[in-house]
Amino acid sequence: MEAMKMKLYVVVLVAVIAFSTVHQTVAAVDAPAPSPTSDASSFIPTFFASVAVMAFGFFF
């Protein structure tokens, strides 16, 4: 039961990251490009993707 909960957590986390990426892509089409010195648009999804990969490697 515990392993199933962990796998469900990972699947939900990956789905949230995928949705965030799609949402940002759609928002990026409407918005002007950020300045080259601003990495705010890529920091949050990169952080969650890194955490998801580390968690996946740790648990599986």
From Swiss-Prot:
Residues 39-60 form a propeptide. One of its GO terms (cellular component) is plasma membrane. It comes from the Eukaryota. A lipid is attached at residue 38 (GPI-anchor amidated serine). It is found in: Cell membrane. The modification 4-hydroxyproline is found at residues 32, 34, 36. GO terms for biological process: root hair elongation. Keywords: Cell membrane, Glycoprotein, GPI-anchor, Hydroxylation, Lipoprotein, Membrane, Proteoglycan, Signal. InterPro entries: AGP3/12/13/14/21. Disruption phenotype: Formation of abnormal long root hairs. It is a lipid-anchor; GPI-anchor. Belongs to the AG-peptide AGP family. Glycans are attached at residues 32, 34, 36. This is Arabinogalactan protein 14. Proteoglycan that seems to be implicated in diverse developmental roles such as differentiation, cell-cell recognition, embryogenesis and programmed cell death. Involved in the regulation of root hair elongation. Contains 4-hydroxyproline; hydroxylated on Pro-32, Pro-34 and Pro-36. O-glycosylated on hydroxyprolines; noncontiguous hydroxylproline residues are glycosylated with arabinogalactan. Residues 1-28 form the signal peptide.
